[in-house]
């Protein structure tokens, strides 16, 4: 999933792959709340093995997480020119811990997305078409969405390297 940072520092889930229900689609997440909100407030990746029991997050979104059937969640900030642009999420529908390999892959994918966004912004700027402010709440463009698809593809390839059978099936 990808959440776009809005002008009031809320995250809105704007892109998703693999959700089983509409519970998280277009969900608005307050700064500091849940996994994504914590990522925004700390500017750091957060990994949760059991969302509804995690002590490091608030639990405003437990019902939506339960409705979707997610257990483990990793969220990583997407930062361009020192500004958070969004949050990249990966969640698993079974009670398995996402290991360091998965967290590292999500973080590397977020870094790749950051580079793509920075290049796109530079190209728009050089063409005189730069839109002021990254926090406009706009939907991702085709190139940005393609990067999210590429991330999904990388995670699927990572599945082959995961030894835990339950986690491999979930990924």
Question: What is each of the regions a protein language model found here?
Answer:
Residues 1-13, 120, 165-168:
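Helix-loop-beta substructure at the N-terminus of cytosolic sensory domains
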Residues 4-6, 13-60, 66, 71:
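Regulatory sensory and allosteric helical modules in signal-transduction proteins
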Residues 41-45, 105-123:
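Signal-transmission/dimerization alpha-helices at domain junctions
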Residues 72-79:
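A short, aliphatic-rich beta-strand micro-motif
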Residues 86-87:
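Short glycine-/small-residue motifs
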Residues 91-106, 116:
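Regulatory loop-to-helix N-cap segments in sensory/regulatory domains
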Residues 118-171:
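Signal-transducing coiled-coil/dimerization helices and immediately adjacent hinge/linker segments
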